[in-house]
Amino acid sequence: MELKVTTLEGKDAGSVQLSDAIFGLEPRVDIIQRCVQWQLNKRQAGTHKAKGRAEIWRTGKKMYKQKGTGGARHGSARVPQFRGGGRAFGPVVRSHATDLPKKVRALALKHALSAKAKDGDLVVLENATLEAAKTKALIGHFSGLGLTNALIIDGAELHNGFAAAARNIPNLDVLPIQGINVYDILRRQKLVLTKAAIDALEARFK
């Protein structure tokens, strides 16, 4: 697969040959969905908590005598059916993380990249550098390229000026190649890869 390379100013900078093993697969929604669910499960806080009957601060004395009152045979005021009692089967602090094999995660990333390429939502930039860290100037460049909702992936090191200028632009994410992931690729309309990012991806999946 061949895509044209453009500069931040919108000028033509040649073309690049993309590996069909990474960008030319037929996207499988089931694999992508498994990876997205794995990511969302992993980042869920799991700090929810409700007190059970053993954790309620209340006397453990029997409420009233067993027989002769005509009432039910209650033994404790901490039980769930009373106001102020403990919660039955309430949420506890736990991890929501699930397991997903590394090979499935890698395959899901390839399918997400292939999906963007197939839909025509993949843009290749020569580089992501900016001389002056000015957000207004960067917005102008992106408007010229038609990028209003995008994820930009650069090489191992982000350019400080570019990252600083992009930080305050809504619907725009900038990540180094180490941070590329399926969920962030799918949540943005366009995927922008620099030539350094493409080289890193091909080296990773070699």
Swiss-Prot record:
GO cellular component: ribonucleoprotein complex; ribosome
UniProt keyword annotations, A-Z: Ribonucleoprotein, Ribosomal protein, RNA-binding, rRNA-binding
Entry's Gene Ontology BP terms: translation
Superkingdom of this protein's organism: Bacteria
Alphabetical list of SUPFAM superfamilies matching this protein: Ribosomal protein L4 (SSF52166)
Pfam family membership, one: Ribosomal_L4
rRNA-binding as UniProt keyword: yes
Keyword Ribosomal protein set for record: yes
GO MF term set: rRNA binding; structural constituent of ribosome
Family: Belongs to the universal ribosomal protein uL4 family.
Main function: One of the primary rRNA binding proteins, this protein initially binds near the 5'-end of the 23S rRNA. It is important during the early stages of 50S assembly. It makes multiple contacts with different domains of the 23S rRNA in the assembled 50S subunit and ribosome. Forms part of the polypeptide exit tunnel.
Subunit structure: Part of the 50S ribosomal subunit.
Protein name, UniProt field: Large ribosomal subunit protein uL4
Organism per entry: Bradyrhizobium sp. (strain BTAi1 / ATCC BAA-1182)
Gene name per UniProt: rplD
